[in-house]
Structure formats: structure tokens, C-alpha cells
Design a protein with these regions (language model features):
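Short linear motifs centered on Gly/Pro in flexible linkers and helix caps
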Residues: 5-8, 27, 52
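Generic low-complexity segments that are intrinsically disordered, proline-rich and/or Lys/Arg-biased
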Residues: 5-8, 22, 117
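Bacterial N-terminal signal peptides that target proteins for export
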Residues: 13-23
């Protein structure tokens, strides 16, 4: 377990409460990664020669749609008056998942597979193609509800919905490995990275909600 030291003036000022979720998440990160490695040991043998499967293509393509929606709603932080801690989280989500979309797209392109080009605007529409709805993705109604909120209300609802979204990504990884796919090394590494990152961020968001660092208003 990681041990982190905080300056005495931060603790005495009472501002330490704001950092509790991040402190706990950082301390748990090493344990999460260790558990992840035990849950899905790396493939044995020359995985590069095993080739990829249709399930791998479905996972890599689906994750592009999944990440695109996460980037979309995380990008609302500034315009929807999110608090500092939520903005920091959103910035990390946008940066990390933008990089992963580039890797996912490159993997598909080099194998001459179709590379999805999702339009975030279409994700707000109820008639969005059901084949593009991955586990945990927000419905058009949920997106519209989040888009209507501002400030602390946005923060609280964003965290709850992003936890749902991240849990869906973990489900996608579990389904990939349960099907016997994910043997090709790049696919395995991507799936493992998604699992570890999203698990850590779920822990972080749950702690942020539990710490009650914002006070949602009650509609009149």
C-alpha cells in the first residue's frame, strides 16, 4: 500500500477533506493493478502469431464508441460549471481516452478493419443505432438530463453516470476474456489497461461522492 505525506498546513487548514478521494484512490492504485494481473494472467506463448478474432474487432471498435461518449460528457465540465475536483477528473478522462482512441483506431486500420467515426451529436438522439450502444453507455435521456444540470448538480450526476459508464467498460473487458478472445498481445494490453484505469477511477469517483465534497441543490 502506498504511503503519502501531506503538509501540516494543509491538514490544519481543513482543506485536507477536499483531497480525501484522491488520496485513497492513489493509495489503492497499486493494489488494483496487482489484482488485475492476477485476475487475467497474460496469454502464454507467442500471442502475436495467434492472430486476432472477430471478438477482438468488436471489442476494439466498441471501445471507440464507448470512449467517444465519455469524452463528450467529460468535455462538458467547463460549460456546465463543474467544481475543481470534477474538472481535474474530466481533464484526465479526456486526455487518456483520446490517446486510447488513437491506439484503437490504429490497431483496426493496420488490420484493414473498419475504423468507427462516431458523431457525438448522434449520441443525443433516441434512435441511435443499437449496435453502437456498448455496456454502460448513457441513454439519450440520461445525456439530456446531465446536459440540463449545472454546478454541484452536474458534479453529482456526472459522477454517478460516469461510474455507470466505467462499469460498462469493465463488463466489456470481462466479456472479451470470457469468450476466449483477447489473446493477441495488443488487444490484451489494451483491455488490461482499460480494466485497471477504469477500476481505479471508479474507486476515485465513489470516494468523491462519499466525501460529499459538493452539495447538490433540490429542485423547487
Amino acid at each position: 500500500m502506498l504511503t503519502l505525506q501531506w503538509p501540516a498546513d494543509v491538514i490544519e487548514s481543513g482543506s485536507m477533506r477536499r483531497f480525501i478521494p484522491w488520496l485513497i484512490a492513489a493509495a489503492c492504485a497499486a493494489d488494483v493493478l496487482s489484482a488485475r494481473a492476477q485476475a487475467f494472467p497474460p496469454p502464454v506463448g507467442d500471442s502475436a502469431r495467434r492472430g486476432y478474432t472477430p471478438a477482438d474487432v468488436h471489442f476494439m471498435s466498441g471501445m471507440i464508441y464507448h470512449h467517444t461518449q465519455a469524452i463528450q460528457i467529460a468535455g462538458w465540465a467547463a460549460s456546465h460549471d463543474a467544481g475543481p475536483s470534477v474538472r481535474t477528473l474530466c481533464e484526465r478522462i479526456v486526455a487518456a481516452q483520446t490517446d486510447e482512441i488513437a491506439l484503437l483506431s490504429r490497431w483496426l486500420a493496420t488490420r484493414h478493419e473498419a475504423v468507427p467515426q462516431p458523431d457525438p451529436a448522434h449520441m443525443m438522439m433516441p434512435e441511435m443505432n443499437a449496435t453502437h450502444i456498448m455496456p454502460g453507455m448513457l441513454s439519450a435521456e440520461q445525456l439530456a438530463q446531465l446536459d440540463r444540470t449545472r454546478g454541484p448538480d452536474f458534479d453529482a450526476l456526472f459522477l454517478r453516470l460516469m461510474i455507470q459508464h466505467h462499469q460498462g467498460a469493465i463488463t466489456m473487458v470481462n466479456q472479451l476474456f470470457a469468450s476466449g478472445a483477447g489473446e493477441e498481445e495488443p488487444v490484451y494490453k489494451m483491455a488490461s489497461s482499460v480494466y485497471a484505469d477504469q477500476t481505479t477511477e471508479i474507486e476515485r469517483m465513489q470516494q468523491m461522492l462519499a466525501a460529499d465534497i459538493f452539495a447538490p441543490t433540490t429542485p423547487k
